[in-house]
């Protein structure tokens, strides 16, 4: 599930690191004996752990809700990335939908990571609406590269917002 063609190589590498919990969140930097005040750059409420940032943060949750609503599914988010990867592929059904569905976690995670780094290193913050649109645009771009999405479906995504 980690290595996906038509997704940039650096994003595939990032996803692989994420599945190994090796992405340099503040929690992982602290494990290397650096003194930090660990706080999520998105919600500014909780410690920045891999599981919080990429699954449970209220900002990230908005992205998970968009895509789960498109599939009309209700789900309980797993506790960690490994559990998510184990259950995610069981939700898809047809071939094209399955392929589109499989890139959703990577799209969400990459959007979250880009926003986090923009806030951390550049001091720039997108509002929630732009954050969601960045994710949807990225998803559409990746699907379009693989001819997995039609224009009508993009409008369905935007209508949700």
What annotation goes with each model-predicted range?
Residues 1-47, 111, 160-161:
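Helix/loop segments that flank and initiate small ligand/metal-binding modules
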Residues 1-5, 89-99, 117-125:
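Short, solvent-exposed helix-loop connector elements
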Residues 10, 14, 24, 49, ...:
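Acidic, Ser/Thr-rich intrinsically disordered and amphipathic helical segments
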Residues 25-29, 63-69, 114-122:
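Short amphipathic alpha-helical interface patches used for protein-protein assembly/oligomerization
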Residues 29-86:
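Short Cys/His-based metal-binding microdomains
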Residues 43, 47, 112-124, 135, ...:
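Residues that mediate protein self-association or partner binding, especially
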Residues 96-114, 120, 160:
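Short flanking/linker segments adjacent to small metal-binding domains or redox-active Cys/His motifs
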Residues 143-161:
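C-terminal helix/juxtamembrane-tail motif
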């Amino acid at each position: 599930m980690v290595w996906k063609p038509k997704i940039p190589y650096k994003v595939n590498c990032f996803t692989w690191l994420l599945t190994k919990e090796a992405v340099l969140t503040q929690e992982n930097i602290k494990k290397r004996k650096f003194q930090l005040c660990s706080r999520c750059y998105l919600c500014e409420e909780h410690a920045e752990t891999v599981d919080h940032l990429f699954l449970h943060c209220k900002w990230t949750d908005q992205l998970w809700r968009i895509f789960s609503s498109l599939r009309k599914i209700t789900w309980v988010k797993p506790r960690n990335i490994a559990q998510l990867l184990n259950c995610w592929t069981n939700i898809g059904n047809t071939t094209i939908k399955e392929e589109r569905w499989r890139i959703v976690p990577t799209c969400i995670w990459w959007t979250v990571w880009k926003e986090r780094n923009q806030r951390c290193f550049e001091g720039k913050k997108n509002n929630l609406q732009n954050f969601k649109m960045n994710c949807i645009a990225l998803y559409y771009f990746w699907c379009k590269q693989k001819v997995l999405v039609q224009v009508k479906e993009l409008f369905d995504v935007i209508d949700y917002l």
